[in-house]
Amino acid sequence: MRAIDAIHAGVGHILCSDYQPSTLIAAAFAASRLADLPLDRALALVTSNPADACLLDDRGRLAPGKRADVIAVGSIAGQPMVTHTWSAGRLVFAAGYPMVQPAAPRTPGVRLTMYG
């Protein structure tokens, strides 16, 4: 069964790779588009769901006390591309192309800030 078919059937909860993890970013965005999933649910396929399945309760989501590296994603020629990476609260990577203006957050009390 293809991953997108499993997601459509409600039985695909994790997208993972043992070879090229960078493809997971594109896979999450494709799952959102092709399976008509809200982006937060599609991103959970590559973040919180795998962490939960591996019993890694200290990571997988952005929350106080959790470990996290954070990326900002832009769209270059229709493809999601990492524009910035933060590790331990420090900017460690910035590409030479701009971030896409984010949509309003769906979570009450969450504020998005643009830098750069």
Protein language model annotation of sequence segments:
Residues 25-33:
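Short, small-residue alpha-helix embedded
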Residues 29, 40-43, 47-116:
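Active-site microenvironment of metallo-dependent hydrolases
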Residues 1-26:
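Short acidic/histidine-rich active-site segments
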Residues 36:
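H/E-rich (His + Asp/Glu) clusters that bind or coordinate divalent metals
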